[in-house]
Structures are given as structure tokens and as C-alpha cells.
């Protein structure tokens, strides 16, 4: 009988993720073993498998969010919070095709056509998603183009910068980990989550195009599965880097979520109006939100 694949990646100074092909995953610390007998001290060098790779990737996301899990805000969705989320969604998607093509070009230069082809296909699939967010903003009565030109939510800025930086590195394999993190989180959104957002929108208004596309109802689930298979096929050093970046991106994403979600309704509305240079009276007068109620979880 063939031996099951075991993969492991050191994530922090004292935590490694260990995953078996069977799907079993655990977090390993050096204190779990006797001195000088840590079986996971040396970086892995063997082949990967889909079962163990998904354990590493999802384990990295869980570990990234674990640091703030107890203080992670979980408010009910509101229109103002959702508008801020759509602006964030625009900024995390508008440069994705360009960045992925830039990374693909670098891998072609490095003689890695298989990685370049994967990234080029992802770039094609992500093209135009920023326009979905703009359509949703316009459907909510907001001048989307002007808003996104003048406003980037503070919690989103570090995430956008991270992706930009990853894609211009000499060896930009980490961009796959970043992309997986965002797509995996998006794929967790179910029909019920979209229905909650639709329920706070004005009647006969379709403002969930981006959210539907970036949920379990859209292409994200398929993208996640494809990425798992592709990462599993990579050399061990590449798999290690992808998993480590998945963790780093999860940290940034979690902190960004919380930064935006802890703002009051009034704070978010003030930011929107300052960016536009005008009041948004239809948001002030809406009966669906009030006072210091907290905002909606970002859409991307």
C-alpha cells in the first residue's frame, strides 16, 4: 500500500501546520516533541497531494484569523456598511488582472511556463469584476466611479499594497497564496448571506452582482478547487511559500475586516460623504439603519 502523503510548513517561529493526504490537519509546536527530535524541523521536500495541500492552505487561513477571532466584529449588514464593502471590493479587484499578468510574465522569464499559464488564465477570469462592484454602487444611488476614485477604505489599503508588492517580486509565487486566501473566504458565503444583503437593499434593486460572483454561488468554489490541485503539483519549496503567504494575507485580511467593521454607521457615512464632497440624504433618511449601529462585513 502506498504511503499517505504528509506535508508540513513552518508558519511562525513556534507553529507549523501538518496535513495528511487523508485530510487530517493539526498545528505542531516544538514543545510537542523532545529536544532535537522534531520531525517537522526540516522543510518538507516530497510531493504534494490535494488532500494535504488543502489542509495546509485552509489551516493557514484559520491560523491567520485565530489571532483576532475573539475580537472579530460580527455586525448585521447595513446599506452604508455594504457600500463601503463594495468600494473595498472594487479596489481589491481592479488591479488583479494586471498584477497577475505581471507575475505571469516574470515566470515566463524564469522558465516556468506552467505557472505563467495558470496566472494568465486567472487574469482572464478576473477581468471585469471591478465593474460589477461599480454597477452595484450605482444601483444603490451612489456615483460609483467618483467614489472609488476618491476613497479607499483604510482596512483595505494594506491588502491592496500586499498584492501589488507580491506581484513585482523577483519570484512572485506568493501571489497564489494571496489569491487563494481571498477566494477561499469568498467561497464561504452562502445563498443566505446574499439574501441578508438583498433584504436591506431597496425593493427592485439588484446590488449583489459582485457578491454573487464572489460566493459559493459564483465561480469561487471552482477556482478554489483548481488552485488546490495546481498548488499540490508544485515543487515543495513553492508549496511552502504559497502556504506561508496564505497565512500572511489572512492576517492582513482579518485585521482589515476588523478595522472597518468596528466603525460606527455615522463614521462610515462621514467618510463616504467626504470622499464625494456631498451629502447622501437617501442614506441619512433610510429607516433601515440608525445611530451608532456597526457596519456590514466586507463583500470581498
Give a label for each model feature.
Residues 1-299:
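Non-heme di-metal
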